[in-house]
Amino acid sequence: MSNVLEEMKTRRSIRKFKPDAIPQEILDQIIEAGTYAANGRGAQNVIIIQVTNKEKRDEIAKKNAEIMGSEGDPFYGAPAMLIVLGKKDWPTHVYDGSLVMGNLMLAAHDLGIGSCWIHRAKEEFESSWGRELLASLGIEDEYEGIGHCALGYVDGDYPDVIPRKRKPRILYQIGRNCKRRTMGKCWK
């Protein structure tokens, strides 16, 4: 099995992080991997905002928790986060941003960093608070929040791989090597 396939199978969402800072060199590698995600027509319209400033990270966590209706830390104590946003006027921005998120999480796992996709970025950046945050960074185009990639060193044991609930199967297959599969259709 290639390393990529192994990383895909063993990566887990981490929900307990150590407070230790991640070296910038490692964050740079994770971000670079995100920029290599497939994207519609090669437009590369997704942006990544790195947040390692604790005060700003805590402010974002508070806003995210408010949206969720909670008072806890939705980022599970992660000392760093990468916020992924897609340009709203691009038809594939949600898909493109989702692929970036996947690359970020796989790269983090490969580099020994835990990660977790945290939702509610869309709601954050639709708010006046979120638009002001983007403006403070000089981001003036219309962007939609896709997700937050919470990053940090795992606090405790790395979670075990959970067996899949079902075996993979092809429900429909078109081609000359087509063989009927359970509950599937086959056209030659």
Language model segments and positions:
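Acidic, surface-exposed loops and disordered segments
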Residues: 1-188
